[in-house]
């Protein structure tokens, strides 16, 4: 990804005064970008290629099957690694990709709950996400631009499906005229281990999920 390199959030007016910034003057709680070429301003020349693509370079799976004394268990694990997920789909030129995470700083659109709950505010000065703004007004519209702030390692491991069953002994079933009886419970997507915020499906982190 070609993005700006983020350096956390601005935490004071003094920090803003002594930093380079992009576009209009930022506010406390906005994302701070690094001036990579040292020219005293943040522009397209400060973008650099960082991280990996958004498709796993490595995918893997594991199927387990076991049986004992009438009980049987099967499970399917899937996973992916060596890829990055961007929590924003807004590019440096303002073009919006088709992801729900794009919409956090767009007027009339929704923001993910994790972002709202952890955004910088006066009441929450230690917030880990930038302050929320109305539409694209002021520097807040720049917080959604593609930068390392929004890149996350997409690796994950998921229990895709599991089934637990029990087959009743024939000696129990024959007297009631039943040849074979098996009961089971089954589940899908039972748990996922990943470093992404809650609500993002690492298999397809897009607008349709």
Region spans (language model):
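Short sequence motifs at beta-strands and strand-loop junctions characteristic
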Residues: 52-57, 149-158, 209
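Membrane-embedded beta-strand positions in outer-membrane beta-barrel channels/transporters
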Residues: 61-63, 161-165, 209
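Predominantly the C-terminal beta-signal and adjacent terminal strand-loop region
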Residues: 192, 196-209
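Extracytoplasmic gating/loop element in the C-terminal half of outer-membrane beta-barrel translocons
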Residues: 9-28, 80-177, 181-182
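Transmembrane beta-strands of outer-membrane beta-barrel pores
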Residues: 68-70, 79-83, 161, 168, ...
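Repeated loop/turn-to-beta-strand initiation elements of outer-membrane beta-barrel proteins
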Residues: 70-74, 171-172
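Acidic carboxylate motifs that coordinate Ca2+ or other divalent cations, activating on Asp/Glu
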Residues: 35, 39, 43
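Membrane-embedded beta-strand positions of outer-membrane beta-barrel proteins
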Residues: 75, 183-185
């Amino acid at each position: 990804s070609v993005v700006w390199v983020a350096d956390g959030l601005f935490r004071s007016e003094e920090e803003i005064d002594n930093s380079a910034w992009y576009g209009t003057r930022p506010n406390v709680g906005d994302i701070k970008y690094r001036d990579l070429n040292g020219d005293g301003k943040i522009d397209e020349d400060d973008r650099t290629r960082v991280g990996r693509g958004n498709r796993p370079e490595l995918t893997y799976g594991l199927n387990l099957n076991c049986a004992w004394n009438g009980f049987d268990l099967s499970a399917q694990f899937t996973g992916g690694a060596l890829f990055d997920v961007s929590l924003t789909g807004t590019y440096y030129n303002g073009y919006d990709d088709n992801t729900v995470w794009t919409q956090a700083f767009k007027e009339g659109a929704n923001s993910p709950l994790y972002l709202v709950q952890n955004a910088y505010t006066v009441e929450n000065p230690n917030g880990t996400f930038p302050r929320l703004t109305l539409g694209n007004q002021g520097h807040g519209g720049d917080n959604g631009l593609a930068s390392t702030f929004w890149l996350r390692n997409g690796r994950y491991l998921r229990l895709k499906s599991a089934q637990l069953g029990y087959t009743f002994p024939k000696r129990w079933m024959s007297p009631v005229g039943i040849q074979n009886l098996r009961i089971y419970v089954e589940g899908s997507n039972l748990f996922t281990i990943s470093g992404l915020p809650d609500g993002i499906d690492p298999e397809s982190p897009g607008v349709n999920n």
